[in-house]
């Protein structure tokens, strides 16, 4: 019974340690995963579909010329 209680206490302490490392490496890794796979991250990937469009209009060409002046 004492061994089970000790294992429970140690596992709770380790879990608390993992949870509190939000500002460390695991936190940065989790934030990167959330931004890449989250709703906003996936929605932002849709913006790149415009680059694959083969139809370029005169307005698109004018915008590109203005952008690279």
UniProtKB/Swiss-Prot annotation:
Key words of the record: Amidation, Antimicrobial, Cleavage on pair of basic residues, Secreted, Signal
Residue positions, PTM Leucine amide: 37
GO CC list: extracellular region
Signal peptide (residue range): 1-23
Compartments where found: Secreted
Domain of life: Eukaryota
Residues cleaved off as propeptide: 38-69
Tissue expression notes: Expressed by the venom gland.
Major place of residence: secreted
Task of the protein: Probable antimicrobial peptide. Shows low inhibitory activity against herpes simplex virus type 1 (HSV-1).
Record family assignment: Belongs to the non-disulfide-bridged peptide (NDBP) superfamily. Short antimicrobial peptide (group 4) family.
Name this polypeptide is given: Antimicrobial peptide Eval36
Annotated source species: Euscorpiops validus
Lineage: Eukaryota, Metazoa, Ecdysozoa, Arthropoda, Chelicerata
């Amino acid at each position: 019974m004492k061994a089970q209680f000790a294992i429970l206490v140690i596992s709770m302490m380790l879990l608390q340690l993992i949870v509190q490392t939000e500002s460390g490496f695991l936190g940065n890794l989790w934030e990167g995963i959330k931004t890449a796979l989250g709703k906003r991250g996936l929605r932002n990937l849709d913006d790149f579909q415009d680059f694959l469009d083969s139809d370029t209009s005169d307005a698109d060409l004018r915008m590109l010329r203005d952008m690279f002046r």
